[in-house]
């Protein structure tokens, strides 16, 4: 494993859904929820 260098949309979306939000943007290693 290690630091993510590219965002995985499916992983980002799942993480956002866990906190009751949806994926806003997914760039580089940053997942933004909204």
From Swiss-Prot:
Compartment annotation: Secreted
GO cellular component term, pick one: extracellular region
UniProtKB keywords: Disulfide bond, Ion channel impairing toxin, Neurotoxin, Potassium channel impairing toxin, Secreted, Toxin, Voltage-gated potassium channel impairing toxin
MF annotations from Gene Ontology: potassium channel regulator activity; toxin activity
Site (Penetrates into Kv1.1 and Kv1.3 pores (when K-21 does not penetrate into it)): 17
Tissue expr: Expressed by the venom gland.
Site feature: Penetrates into Kv1.1 and Kv1.3 pores (when K-17 does not penetrate into it): 21
Transmembrane segments: none
Role played: Reversibly blocks Shaker B potassium channels.
Entry similarity comment: Belongs to the short scorpion toxin superfamily. Potassium channel inhibitor family. Alpha-KTx 18 subfamily.
Domain notes from UniProt: Has the structural arrangement of an alpha-helix connected to a beta-sheet by disulfide bonds (CSalpha/beta).
Descriptive protein name: Potassium channel toxin alpha-KTx 18.2
């Amino acid at each position: 494993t290690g630091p993510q260098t590219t965002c995985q949309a499916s992983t980002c979306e799942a993480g956002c859904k866990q906190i009751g939000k949806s994926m806003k943007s997914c760039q580089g290693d940053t997942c933004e929820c909204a």
